[in-house]
Curated annotation (Swiss-Prot):
InterPro entries: Ribosomal_uL22, Ribosomal_uL22_bac/chlpt-type, Ribosomal_uL22_bac/org-type, Ribosomal_uL22_CS, Ribosomal_uL22_sf. This is Large ribosomal subunit protein uL22. GO terms for biological process: translation. PROSITE patterns: RIBOSOMAL_L22. It comes from the Bacteria. Keywords: Ribonucleoprotein, Ribosomal protein, RNA-binding, rRNA-binding. Belongs to the universal ribosomal protein uL22 family. It holds the Pfam family Ribosomal_L22. Part of the 50S ribosomal subunit. GO terms for cellular component: cytosolic large ribosomal subunit. It comes from Hydrogenovibrio crunogenus (strain DSM 25203 / XCL-2). The gene is rplV.
């Protein structure tokens, strides 16, 4: 049984969010929740919400036992990019790319 949860259009760079996804992939859910709770990265808070949602989905929709769940997949895809301008000297401008992520966490039986 595989149950997933997704947070689309998260305002964080995929490169930064993937660092946190790599920490919890393959771990059991109790360990993953503790890792995210003690991580000081912004992405860990977003990933924690998605993980808790996936756990709740497994418990309520599938009747799964929380103690037997493990994080089978955790990945971050790139969403649309917001393009902004920063004014520079002599009437020029530089482009700023505000990157957006789609975070997906899948939990399943051990």
């Amino acid at each position: 049984m595989q149950v997933s949860a997704t947070h689309r259009f998260a305002r964080i760079s995929p490169q930064k969010a993937r660092l946190v996804a790599d920490l919890i992939r393959g771990k059991d859910v109790e360990t993953a929740v503790n890792i995210l709770a003690f991580s000081d990265k912004k992405a860990s808070e977003l990933m924690s919400k998605v993980l808790n949602s996936a756990i709740a989905n497994a418990e309520n929709n599938e009747g799964a036992d929380i103690d037997e769940l493990k994080v089978t997949e955790a990945y971050v895809n790139e969403g649309p990019i917001m393009k902004r301008m920063r004014a520079r000297a002599k009437g020029r401008g530089n482009r700023i790319l505000k990157r957006i992520s789609h975070i997906t966490v899948t939990v399943g039986d051990k």
